[in-house]
Amino acid sequence: MSSNNAGESDGTGPALPTVWPGNAYPLGATYDGAGTNFSLFSEIAEKVELCLIDEDGVESRIPLDEVDGYVWHAYLPNITPGQRYGFRVHGPFDPAAGHRCDPSKLLLDPYGKSFHGDFTFGQALYSYDVNAVDPDSTPPMVDSLGHTMTSVVINPFFDWAYDRSPRTPYHETVIYEAHVKGMTQTHPSIPPELRGTYAGLAHPVIIDHLNELNVTAVELMPVHQFLHDSRLLDLGLRNYWGYNTFGFFAPHHQYASTRQAGSAVAEFKTMVRSLHEAGIEVILDVVYNHTAEGNHLGPTINFRGIDNTAYYRLMDHDLRFYKDFTGTGNSLNARHPHTLQLIMDSLRYWVIEMHVDGFRFDLASTLARELHDVDRLSAFFDLVQQDPVVSQVKLIAEPWDVGEGGYQVGNFPGLWTEWNGKYRDTVRDYWRGEPATLGEFASRLTGSSDLYEATGRRPSASINFVTAHDGFTLNDLVSYNDKHNEANGENNRDGESYNRSWNCGVEGPTDDPDILALRARQMRNMWATLMVSQGTPMIAHGDEIGRTQYGNNNVYCQDSELSWMDWSLVDKNADLLAFARKATTLRKNHKVFRRRRFFEGEPIRSGDEVRDIAWLTPSGREMTHEDWGRGFDRCVAVFLNGEAITAPDARGERVVDDSFLLCFNAHDHDVEFVMPHDGYAQQWTGELDTNDPVGDIDLTVTATDTFSVPARSLLVLRKTL
């Protein structure tokens, strides 16, 4: 029903609540213990109605008569948490001018803290006749109530007890990229009702697993409220990854263990509190580059119907269409002050109210586009830099998008760290035996100073990874040359075709013991390389137990056993898990692998005989320019001087660690290595050997001794005398 008379009824429905003017800010629905303030920004609106939905789905419409600076608002006493609501925005529907107001659509609150229900795809969600030839024709005005989700007023009060962020320094951080459902859906020790939920991720068995891997931060794939788009649903698939968000303040409701409206908020907070108690930070993968509304043929859920030109980048020559730097149909307009405010308010909310510790920005280059080009001095970066809250948490960029000039690895500002795609590519190429990779490999192993030093950043700015959610798992990287994405319903056209992978001789599953042994060794090689590299390592969930997606490198739509972690692999691949734990423990125990400053390649103190780092040939002498120029060399020994760490510790004290020698052999045959002269060390002891299933080695050698490094393996030696 609809009425302009607060507190009265027209006889066809319940009496409308009392309405007070309220405040323009904060935006969204804010409960204060006595009532709720509602506010919505729309510059194009001519009229806005707040719609309250009762338990039976009956709607009461309340005009928002107060407008300050294009913010429509009201305060309703006695409106309490659990109240479902939405907005109807009256204004021009003129696609040629970029305007798409449609009051037949119940619009979700851009600042909604929780959402309830689900979407039913059909004419009701679209502001054009889906059967018409011209999608710009007058909309059919089919009401979306009952076919769309509803926003929910939440209770903001929560007992955080003594919660504190671990605030782990970057150089001590080990990131574990995880999916809330995929991580927990099949774990036998998690109660069935908690599997696939925030509560499941906070279960002691998951926390113990992370602690045993020495993980200090989980990077959660999108948990902002997202949509399962109609194309996937028609194929019997789902938007598993979650990169199709529309609720930047709300934890995805399907990851809550109960379906009670608003329950996801408290459950998410409880998860964060539990992880913090275990010393684990929570980083969110956030998608502020686009929304779930898609292109001009997409549904009208919220932003499109509220103020299309404010929230989206439209084509200059034809405002009916959307600029798409993301491959999803639209791009958020981060140049508009209210859209920038939305993003910054969202980031602050998750830090202040939800206690998260950082963000990984999906396709971050899109946020930096001012006109068309990526600009590292864009308004978005300026706002982040000066924000007293957001600037103090971990900020990680995925430094590319699909637009021209979008690949920006190494070009983000000083506060930021970056997914180092060049590290991933180089490590993969080196271990699969590609020629002319040794020099590049050396740069990536030592923190990628060529990418980050010029902007005043340190090795930790490089988020090093070999695998992530997007692409092959580590097991598949050594088992498949080609993608096998037929299950995605796109005739294997989707996903990256150039994976820098090597199947070790047979495509996919095999019983050949030699191939299986080689694959296992290659996985250990990349694990160990990641853990001895300068920078911040990131692990993809399940790689520690050899998770496989059977060659599918794009499981964005596979909410099934294909993408979930198979916890039975803990027993089947126990050796790999033991090796992974050993490698991460080695890194944790030795600061020489996590230096705060780049190597200088020189002696650090007068009188020192050796440099802070030295590159040696298998014969034990230092590498020359000619050695680096030999394209087919795949062997190198790296001396890391633990007594030449220049950055002091947190108390200003000198940092001293053991020295190490890393012997890399990516050839397909064993190679004899000669230990360097006694100026480096008189005696060395083996610490980690990728040729052994669990990394064990019983080896002690002295200066100038000769020993063999097996084909395609890495040997880590520690100076003991």
From Swiss-Prot:
It holds the Pfam family CBM_48. The active site is at D362, E398. SMART domains: Aamy. GO terms for molecular function: glycogen debranching enzyme activity; hydrolase activity, hydrolyzing O-glycosyl compounds. The record marks D470 as: Transition state stabilizer. One of its GO terms (biological process) is glycogen catabolic process. CDD domains: AmyAc_Glg_debranch (cd11326), E_set_GDE_Isoamylase_N (cd02856). Its EC number is 3.2.1.-. Keywords: Glycosidase, Hydrolase. InterPro entries: GlgX_Isoamylase_N_E_set, Glyco_hydro_13_cat_dom, Glyco_hydro_13_N, Glyco_hydro_b, Glycogen_debranch_GlgX, Glycoside_hydrolase_SF, Ig-like_fold, Ig_E-set. Belongs to the glycosyl hydrolase 13 family. This is Glycogen operon protein GlgX homolog. The gene is glgX.
